[in-house]
Swiss-Prot record:
Keywords: Activator, Chromatin regulator, mRNA transport, Nucleus, Protein transport, Transcription, Transcription regulation, Translocation, Transport. One of its GO terms (biological process) is transcription elongation by RNA polymerase II. InterPro entries: TF_ENY2 (IPR018783), TF_EnY2_sf (IPR038212). Component of the nuclear pore complex (NPC)-associated TREX-2 complex (transcription and export complex 2). Component of the SAGA transcription coactivator-HAT complex. Within the SAGA complex, participates in a subcomplex of SAGA called the DUB module (deubiquitination module). The keyword DNA-binding does not apply. Its main location: nucleus. It is found in: Nucleus, Nucleoplasm. Involved in mRNA export coupled transcription activation by association with both the TREX-2 and the SAGA complexes. The transcription regulatory histone acetylation (HAT) complex SAGA is a multiprotein complex that activates transcription by remodeling chromatin and mediating histone acetylation and deubiquitination. Within the SAGA complex, participates in a subcomplex that specifically deubiquitinates histones. The SAGA complex is recruited to specific gene promoters by activators, where it is required for transcription. This is Transcription and mRNA export factor ENY2. It comes from Taeniopygia guttata (Zebra finch). Belongs to the ENY2 family. The gene is ENY2.
Length: 96
């Protein structure tokens, strides 16, 4: 395992141990619902299913189709807030 992968694993473990990972996931979930992201993605899924027909779409197809759009639709403000929370966490646990 290279140094970056090892550092990521250590940080992830610390996020899990402290419960911060779950708090970050909840924050993200709430922010995405609040900004309408979830509704936009749901509508996009419906459009894809209508376009291709229910019988011709698998879950994997749907995921492959909507993932790029889903990532692109996450508002910068949400990304920045989450990144700031992660940076704050890392600063508080600098001994990693």
């Amino acid at each position: 395992m290279n140094k970056d992968a090892q550092m990521r694993a250590t940080i992830n473990q610390k996020l899990i141990e402290t419960g911060e990972r779950e708090r970050l996931k909840e924050l993200l979930r709430a922010k995405l619902i609040e900004c309408g992201w979830k509704d936009q993605l749901k509508a996009h899924c419906k459009d894809v299913i209508k376009e291709k027909g229910l019988e011709h779409v698998t879950v994997d197809d749907l995921v492959a189709e909507i993932t790029p759009k889903g990532r692109a639709l996450v508002p910068d403000s949400v990304k920045k807030e989450l990144l700031q929370r992660i940076r704050t966490f890392l600063a508080q646990h600098a001994s990693l």
